[in-house]
From Swiss-Prot:
Species name: Arabidopsis thaliana (Mouse-ear cress)
InterPro entries reported for this sequence: SNARE (IPR010989), Syntaxin (IPR045242), Syntaxin/epimorphin_CS (IPR006012), Syntaxin_N (IPR006011), T_SNARE_dom (IPR000727)
Disulphide-bonded residues: none
Residue span of region Disordered: 1-23
Keywords associated with the record: Acetylation, Coiled coil, Membrane, Protein transport, Transmembrane, Transmembrane helix, Transport, Vacuole
Coiled coil, from the record: none
Residues in compartment: Cytoplasmic: 2-246
SUPFAM superfamilies reported in the protein's UniProt record: t-snare proteins
First and last residue of the signal peptide: none
Domain t-SNARE coiled-coil homology: 175-237
Designated name of the protein: Syntaxin-22
Entry membrane topology: Single-pass type IV membrane protein
Tissue: Expressed in roots, leaves, stems, flower and green siliques.
Any one biological process term the GO annotation gives: late endosome to vacuole transport
Amino acid sequence: MSFQDLESGRGRSTRKFNGGRQDSTQAVASGIFQINTGVSTFQRLVNTLGTPKDTPELREKLHKTRLHIGQLVKDTSAKLKEASETDHQSGVNPSKKIADAKLARDFQAVLKEFQKAQQTAAERETTYTPFVPQSALPSSYTAGEVDKVPEQRAQLQESKRQELVLLDNEIAFNEAVIEEREQGIQEIHQQIGEVNEIFKDLAVLVNDQGVMIDDIGTHIDNSRAATSQGKSQLVQAAKTQKSNSSLTCLLLVIFGIVLLIVIIVLAA
């Protein structure tokens, strides 16, 4: 099941299921679709890091997108575990088990893409500093620039004072940008760890579902073998019955001939 047909195919694949089982499968399919869309957006934002478009606003958008995807991953993982637990109950349609196993593999694939994008984001956010437009600098910057060429001595002293204020403000501003960047990097690494843990749990779940699907396949193969064997036995029984019927007819004919000969002899 590809990501392109998740939205169109999930309805057909789960419509036959009823109650909560249908809801859990649909929720997983919807979650995977949203994660895949979010990861595509996240990758485009990551590719912008280190370019002139890399601004604090872009970093903030990247941060929000990353948190949104992380929440979707947690919710979808919980729904998938719920669906998997349901699949282990008796009386569950085998088609649902197969559909859930495919969704688990799709979830695993999109998580790999998210992990790669997270790693790239961490590397680029560590390497590059966001570009800060002049309009974002402290307001005292303009005043300092105006007073750079004073006509009087008092104005020159005031200009120097303004330059010192500007320097202090700019240093404080840069420190705030650096602190915000470091905080973002820490959050990335924290989320990478969380996604890695979910990925490990998912690998166990996928393996478990693979064993379950193999059991379903073995059961189907055994049923087919038993059906084929039953047909063979029926054919053999039919042949035996036909052979017995032919032998009975032959014996009746022989008995009739013998009886006819005896009657002829007695009549003579």
